[in-house]
UniProtKB/Swiss-Prot annotation:
Its EC number is 2.5.1.-. Pathway: Protein modification; protein glycosylation. Catalyzes cis-prenyl chain elongation to produce the polyprenyl backbone of dolichol, a glycosyl carrier-lipid required for the biosynthesis of several classes of glycoprotein. InterPro entries: UPP_synth-like, UPP_synth-like_CS, UPP_synth-like_sf. This is Dehydrodolichyl diphosphate synthase 7.
Length: 271
């Protein structure tokens, strides 16, 4: 057996052991309540690139996409049915035009890769939904996101909402306008506009409100991300930058959610 074959066998054994360890860990974790929807504010890609002297405007974001892959895998194995990702907010468009183009090109690259995987049946039961002001994005990107959503719409193992060109402020304006148009179209009285009418027209109305919001990079803000929907959610912050987020960070956040369950339940009842 040559050296390369030995390395391949060792890697295979290591991966198998890690998989068994995760299954055992997740089985223990599932004794307690599991969040229905976990939202991630993925902060720290640029700082990660600077910290590790990575070259290229998209270097940190490429590292961040690796974390997305693993975090989604862990959530699926745990049994979390919904995940919401703050991928690119409206405020991010205020960055330099070169960086914005670089990041959007990278996102398009990953969307097209996911399309290829969906066509070949390798999405592992994951459904992708894009939410935000998609009309503000270029036609090529919109067409790609639409195709990926169509290809994965029957998948149910894990539903992932990717928020692009998104902010809560924009979402509320959109929802109020859409609900008013609905009322007028149906001949209803606008005075009778209900809270539920607005919430039904939110970009993210297709999924439950988040139970747990995880923010990386040490920040305490929600950054205009789902502030309407997270009034009863647990916010967990971690100093880890997004590309550094791993299995144990996720497990610790869920354990914190489980410890706070009584408080969160009482808060929901009071509201």
């Amino acid at each position: 057996m040559n050296t390369l074959e030995e390395v391949d066998e060792s890697t295979h054994i290591f991966n198998a052991l890690m998989s068994l360890m995760r299954k055992f860990l997740f089985r223990v974790l599932c004794v307690g309540p599991i969040p229905t929807n976990i939202s991630f504010i993925m902060d720290g890609n640029r700082r990660f690139a600077k910290k590790h002297n990575l070259i290229g405007l998209d270097a940190g974001h490429r590292a961040g996409f690796i974390s997305v892959k693993y975090i989604l895998q862990y959530c699926k194995e745990i049994g979390v049915p919904y995940v919401t990702l703050h991928a690119f907010g409206m405020d991010n468009f205020k960055r330099g035009p070169e960086e914005v183009k670089c990041v959007m090109d990278l996102m398009l690259e990953k969307v097209e890769l996911a399309i290829d995987q969906a066509v070949s049946g390798n999405m592992n039961g994951v459904r992708i939904i894009f939410a935000g002001d998609l009309d503000s994005l270029n036609e090529h990107f919109r067409a790609a996101t639409k195709k990926l959503m169509e290809l994965t719409e029957e998948n149910r193992d894990l539903i992932v909402v990717v928020c692009v060109a998104y902010s809560t402020s924009l979402e509320i304006v959109h929802a109020v306008r859409k609900s008013c148009v609905r009322k007028c179209t149906n001949g209803d009285d606008l005075v009778l506009l209900e809270l539920s009418d607005v919430e039904e027209c939110m970009y993210t109305s297709i999924v439950p409100v988040p139970d747990l919001v995880i923010r990386t990079g040490g920040g305490d803000r929600l950054s205009n991300f789902m502030t309407w929907q997270t009034s009863r959610s647990l916010l967990h912050r971690t100093e880890a930058l997004w590309p550094e987020l791993g299995l144990w960070h996720l497990v610790w956040a869920i354990l914190k959610f489980q410890r706070m369950q009584d408080y969160l339940t009482k808060k929901k009842k009071l509201d």
